[in-house]
Amino acid sequence: MPRPDNARGLRIAAAVAVAFGLLTIMEGGSVLFGSEAARLEAGHYVPFVLWFNFLAGFVYVVAGAGLWARRRWAAWLALSVAVGTAAVFAAFAILILLGGAFELRTVAAMSLRTTVWAVIFAYASRRIAP
């Protein structure tokens, strides 16, 4: 049963989503479009993971704005982000199992991203009335 009474919690979730999105865009953009030094500092990054996360950063911001405005579609967008991130994480896991080069911090980051978006969806879907 939705609990539409918790605007504060949704605002916190929205702020987390927007901040996470802006940081993702900045970090991913610096590797994709920045200097060679930025790419070297990133180590063995995986291009499809990097591109997905960079583009998803923009979706994070849109989802955060929707959550702030208490729009039901924002909860479904959060689910889409969680599922998409999990799918890219699974493809990344296959790359690792096949012996591809990677950074351990990417495993941690993808775990965090998947968890954060699953939690945001679970929370928002219970707080925004249909």
Placement of each model-derived feature along the sequence:
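Topology signature of small-to-medium multi-pass alpha-helical membrane proteins
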Residues: 1-130
